[in-house]
């Protein structure tokens, strides 16, 4: 039952967040739910509507995390890595919502684009999940070098995934622009997405 599933997510996100580890786990849970929803939704529009709700419900985690001064002693990269997971989700929610109203894409193409965003979110969420043992130490023992190496690796992966999400967006918007240009309808594309030079 999809509606019940979303309700469960909302309840989870009402927890009182008392430590950074819970913030990170909340963000990971939110993105994982977005990925799961987009895999089970019947089409691109329903996918976007469901995942947008989940993203908005989880937004409080990102806002609270931005206010945390010391997530891990001496490692701003951990905080930046987690926040990039939110950035990637936002890139999908904001841009794909516009693509859904773009007549230059077919339904099949929109489904394929959604699948591409899904893959990027899934991989980036897995990377962040690896940081949990650093943020909330468990029985897993890591020396300083191992921790630093893990943080640097995950940070590098997240920078890559964020760039990939932006590149993927630009690539798809450029397809729309070229199709519109053939019909002399470029202005409609600019009106929909804006004239940000990074897209064109």
What annotation goes with each model-predicted range?
Residues 1-10:
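Single conserved hydrophobic/aromatic residue that forms the stacking wall/gate
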Residues 12-74:
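Start-of-domain marker
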Residues 30, 40, 106, 172, ...:
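Alpha-helical heptad-repeat coiled-coil segments that mediate oligomerization/polymerization in large
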Residues 36, 64, 137-140, 174-181:
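Perimembrane helix-loop junctions in membrane proteins
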Residues 36, 43, 50, 57, ...:
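Residues on one face of amphipathic alpha-helical coiled coils
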Residues 47-120:
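Long, charged all-alpha helical bundle/coiled-coil segments in cytosolic proteins
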Residues 88-168:
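Extended amphipathic alpha-helical interaction segments
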Residues 174-200:
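A cross-kingdom marker for long, charged
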